[in-house]
Amino acid sequence: MSEVLRSFGLAVRIFRERQGWSQAQLAQNSGIDRAYISRIESGGVDPGLEMQRRLANALGISHTELIAQAEEEEQRRRRRPDRSGDQPA
């Protein structure tokens, strides 16, 4: 699983939880299947641009805000030491 996809999924979850929504509520508001949202949030699927825009629109944010949050999460992941305690290269 790609770290970028995991970071994007985490960004979706962060914004969803800020709304106080369950995955089912996001699914209803976006028209995207709940199981697919679960896969997005876990980093198990690469949502295309249209899907990203639908998620952002449902969450009441811009696509740019969603991507910026994903990039921030990716930077946090890179700064964290790995399990052995070494800093990432």
Question: Which residues make up each language-model segment?
Answer:
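Recognition helix of helix-turn-helix/homeodomain-like DNA-binding domains
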Residues: G31-V45
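Short amphipathic helical patch at the helix-1/turn junction of helix-turn-helix
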Residues: R6, E17-R18, D46
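DNA major-groove recognition helix of helix-turn-helix
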Residues: E41, M51, A70
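DNA major-groove recognition helix of helix-turn-helix/homeodomain DNA-binding modules
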Residues: E50-E65
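Short, charged recognition helix plus adjacent turn
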Residues: S2, E65-A89
